[in-house]
Amino acid sequence: DFQPAGDLFSAYETSVEKTYAGILAKREKRREYGFENFGDDTFEWGYGPSYTYWSNSEYDHHHGFLLQFLRSGDGRWWELGEQQARHYRDIVVPHAGAPSRRGGPVHHNATSLWMPQHPEQFWIADHTIAGSSCSHSWAEGMVDYWYLTGDPWAGEVVREMADWYCDRIENNAFGAGGQERGPGWALIAVSALAGAVPSPRLMRAGQTIADWIIAWQDPLRGVVSVPISEQPSY
């Protein structure tokens, strides 16, 4: 049985309701439907010109949706979480190709064919055009979905992702030398995967990232100082 959500944090609960309504309203307005699209969502971003992107579950939306379902027992969040988890499982994560690609979630991708100001709007199925990188990939939501459903295909994807992360980390391709988000997101993902499918290889991968962060973290400011002049918004 679920413990009903109380009213102690009313401001938070109000924001949750607004978020749910906003997700559905945007889905309807932008027609975020279709065999390859449903479950994903869109956002705008850019330096100067702003483009519309398929997020490919940027920042692990289904992880948040499923946690909200668990804390509230509200089935609406289960529906959203399952929809996005299945999209991540079937579309975002490649299941064939070289080790550098197979199991590596594809990050967000822009299309100039749909923008809010365009009079004629349509989508193209471009979820798989971009590449994969540890700075734009997440694993906790897929682990959540596997644990909550026992779905064998989700479990297979979790194992594929574990192999991909280990391959990237063993080849020093986890974002070392760049912004904190590469090593940071990779360590979060590897930690979740190590809890789901524990292995010495995953533990070594996590230790590799942790060692790099400790070695390069600024002892006073607590950040990793790297030049990112090509990205002025940072």
Which ranges hold each PLM region?
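Catalytic cores of extracellular degradative/oxidative enzymes
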Residues: 1-234
